[in-house]
Amino acid sequence: MTLSKTPPRIERFGDITEVIPLPNLTEVQVNSFKAFLQDDKAPDQREDVGLQSAFREVFPIDESEKGRSTGMVLDFIEYRLGEPEYSPEECREKDLTYEAPLYVKLELIHKDTGVIKGFKPDSPPESWVFLGNLPLMTFDGSFIINGADRVVISQIHRSPGVYFTSSYKGIKKQYTAAIIPMPKRGPWIELEFAGDVLEMKVNKRKFPVSLLLRVLGMDDASIRALFTEFTPEVEPGEDKSAGMGADEALLRLFTVLRPGDPPKRDKAIQYLFGLLADPRRYDLGEPGRFKMNTKLGVQRQERTLLKFEDGKFSDAGLVDTIRYLMALQQGLETVPMVDEDGVVTDVPVAEDDIDHLGNRRVRTVGELLADQLRVGMGRMARGVRERMLLGNPDAATPTKLVNNRPIVAAMREFFGRSQLSQFKDQTNPLSDLRHKRRISALGPGGLTRERAGFDVRDVHRTHYGRICPIETPEGANIGLISSLSSYAKVNDLGFIMAPYRKVEDGKVTNQVEYMTADIEDRYTIAQANSPLNEDNTFADERVLARRKGDPLLYTPDEVDYMDVSPKQIVSINTSLIPFLEHDDANRALMGSNMQSQAVPLVRADSPAVGTGVERRVVTDSGTSVVSDVNGRVSYVDARAIQVTLSEDHRELNMNAGNVRTFELIRFTRSNQGTNLDQHPIVSVGDEVKVGQVIADGPASERGRLALGQNITIAIMPFDGFNFEDAICINEDLVRQDFYTSVHIEKDEIEARDTKLGPEKITRDIPGLSEAALRDLDEDGIVRVGAEVKPGDILVGKTSFKGESEPTPEERLLRSIFGEKAREVKDTSLRVQSGQGGIVVKTVRFRRGDEGVDLKPGVREMVRVYVAQKRQLQVGDKVANRHGNKGVVSKIVRPEDMPYLEDGTPVDIVFNPLGVPSRMNLGQILETHLGEVARLTGQKFETPVFDSVTEATIKEMLEVAAAERLQARKDDGFELDKREQEVLDRAGKLGVIDAPGDDYEKGQMQLARTGKSILYDGRTGEPISGPVVVGIMYVMKLYHMVEDKLHARSTGPYSLITQQPLGGKAQFGGQRFGEMEVWALEAYGAAHVLQEMLTIKSDDIDGRDAAYQSIVKGEEVSGSTIPESFKVLVKELHSLGLDVEVLDHGDKAVDIFEGMMPKR
């Protein structure tokens, strides 16, 4: 349990060499936002994505409004981003948004005269139009909105494209086709059979598809040929549109789709164009057209379903979809498809699996932002058209026409209210990283918890290497929120890719290819643990490999690819669990989730048994300081590190000899109230390289993730104190601050202008002693370093009391003798109950200060940060990485804990019954390897699915035991009789062979089992059987009893029910429900029950009287009528039932007296 000064040696196990390192773990966020902005590219080289595509779709704004021509065109040339006004740190401090101004070059062209207004090549910078501020992403992949860190998580949804699914109508299997555009970019179109007729469904309106085919210019013969292509002998269903021309069919179609509107050709063309042919309103998107081309075996470029040229509609994929559906319905295996070039290919026919990851795509932050921007720009464009129509054309300029408010509002709404923009989880570096790699199926345009069935939540074979099959929440969101696998990437179309090593002629190469799920289905892929020879050929004659998810044995020549790493299946959280392959998935899920709830400790200690991923979490999460230069450390203190460069760094515009300064964060509050603190781990003169951690952040030790502590544990019953997952701990853990964490609370108070006069932040508070004000400065703000307890004043504030209107005489006297001192009341900010600690920082914001934006009516605001040191206590939740969790039930003195033969007391006692039924045996192997770490003083890394073998652990335990036995002999110690008895018992139990007289051999055998002889600390007697003892990595979780413990004597009541409020935040009471009432009834506790239902609940007069009796020390009198009874009576009155309340003398009592005016 000691923390050594010199870092221990780390020994790495694992036979599989990984050909590529883990990619940057936040790249899914950073790359997406970079592609959205494209601010590093010249305007003429920007691709049509993100911001650029949003502008290109809205501009030029020139359409006629309600038949009236605008006579002007507003066109877009380019955009640029200005510099952010404040740094991220300043934004966090001042509650600002980290953002940059967005400017656009626009030109206004008059159609009649050809005059161009707005931007000209020689125009000054002021001619750029300001479109509002755009929030920027910080280097670590998060946003700062109103001073708080937020993360925009990626959304997974059904990819646009064409899908063929089946359902049964009676015993007949019927197929349906669905053509899906990009979200909010057009209607879903369904093609299904109604008897023999193929119908099309658009916007919940059905019509025969032949109607639309006639609009596309097809005649009776070509439609008949289409429907009888695969079944020439079968007569097609009745066609009610037979003999119609294109125009007649168009009008008929318009009356079906818009039954209320008069059918006119121009209007019908305009409507159908907007519905399916206008790229601005109907968009399959690049992913949709790609999926459609892949499915139908054609190569089309249009992103709409219909084309409109020369006043006529033509097909862009609808006929191909119908032919494929007909072939599927007829049970054909292939369908001949003709490309635009006239090339015929046979395309395989099959229905789609909608949960296949080839059919689901991820909308990353850049796409979500672009969509939101489109919404804002659409509103802006409507405003521009109105101003064009109503304003003076000669006076119009781009700046006058464009109003940026809709764009600003759309961005504010997205970051502030969207389900996908979330308050960042900053509990520890791992939770921070995990939040950015989250994928949600919920959110706008996605699923809802209630509608999502089992299939969409379930693990699919295509999740392999793309989405973690283990890490997901346990509640209603199970399967809907998931995590990206460790090596997975998202391609430009939004499909998740997994990496594989190419196999050529049975030889595995180091060439790595990333593949989407539908491409992977074409190949046979071997696992990463397939044994290889030195020349990278497969060692076995038959290789276990999978094709379309089915594992089979193949010859080496049949294998196309091989996994790059065993951990590519699981997420980062899950890959941190050692011996994961020995854990049941349900418990591994809990272990993955609980690591993100671990509180950073004051004494960080990286795991004795890790997996090798710990370093990458620290470098990629952004919570530690990582060097971006090569050089030598020239200066170090608690606030900054300076590195003198040893070579040029062109990307930073720095040359060799320049000094790079890294600022450190000290005692900053995270979103969850944990302590963000960085401290240097380099010294002056040290050489540093790019990517090296030079300052540890929270939960980091020498650049390795350190979420918990390496604790000596025993797995044994302990007098019932560890019953039902309760956990006994050694008091030394508390005394030596092993599980002590720092938590920082933020309190703030505003001084407003009120009707009665301005509130004032001051030290001059009426009715308080000097002792109560001892820690306040002259302005009434608590000093930094003061220790505060519940009820202490943090910021002194006074407000004017309300007073009655003065009489004319008083006004006269006041005007003669001057204003009398008006009475003020104390409205100071005090420490809430259950809180307190040391004041670490105070900040004061006044209206008019630079960068300060206070709410209307607020003159100034003071914010106080109070840090609290929390030690481990009874009721705190602790857990290991394998899902074994529990609550501390008893803190035992070290002398009473079980101890080893050398006198070392164990630190934690876990219940053995918590292991077998939960099947998380990884924790036992971790404990055994941890015992080797304890005995040898080193640390180990054992990668998931490539762990150290049990045989190796046994040998290591035996070697360590032999050294320990020899040391005992050298010191003159022999095995005593009590230890011999334990070994004899172990022999009877079958743990070891019966030792006979050879107790030395018995000891060596016992060491191989990972068990030890343990002594009871209270009696000194050995525990009757051998016990598993070793080091386990145990974390303290965010669920601390101090935040949850709550008691109420009196407090606020609900205005409507007059019952106490609920919850700790409202200082509420505990609900006494019907089952609790039954319990008191069962025991006949009549008086207690009456008290619960009356004076402790909603008996207003009774509780007032009881309170007064308690204050005066008198006996509490009986109760009166509770409010809920009065409600019941009124309910019965409303049903027309006359209910009267009678006293003992059968006289009617008016229980509503004084409540309502008499009639």
From Swiss-Prot:
One of its GO terms (cellular component) is DNA-directed RNA polymerase complex. GO terms for biological process: DNA-templated transcription. SUPFAM superfamilies: beta and beta-prime subunits of DNA dependent RNA-polymerase. Pfam families: RNA_pol_Rpb2_1, RNA_pol_Rpb2_2, RNA_pol_Rpb2_3, RNA_pol_Rpb2_45, RNA_pol_Rpb2_6, RNA_pol_Rpb2_7. The RNAP catalytic core consists of 2 alpha, 1 beta, 1 beta' and 1 omega subunit. When a sigma factor is associated with the core the holoenzyme is formed, which can initiate transcription. Belongs to the RNA polymerase beta chain family. DNA-dependent RNA polymerase catalyzes the transcription of DNA into RNA using the four ribonucleoside triphosphates as substrates. This is DNA-directed RNA polymerase subunit beta. The lineage of its organism: Bacteria, Thermotogati, Deinococcota, Deinococci, Deinococcales.
